[in-house]
């Protein structure tokens, strides 16, 4: 599970640094004659992201996370976007409450 805010359309620098640390040839992926192959198989990813705006999963950060984990071999990815708190601050509490309910539902199958 990865839970992150959206900062300036990307992941926080500490998370980027962690990705750089764990993306290691021979450990988490390998090179083959036909290209790279992820070595982390049979794992799931749940990506939870808080956004001030509304992007519907099309922001660069969520695409980056999905791409990195796919490269490492994790194909079973679920996403939960709790978004719009800055766009609609009057409804931020209900946006967060709805996100918590969605997280509870996702947690039943994760």
Identify the meaning behind each predicted range.
Residues 2-63:
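Helix-loop-strand module that forms the ligand-binding subsite of alpha/beta enzymes
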Residues 57-110:
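Glycine-rich phosphate/pyrophosphate-binding loop and the adjoining helix
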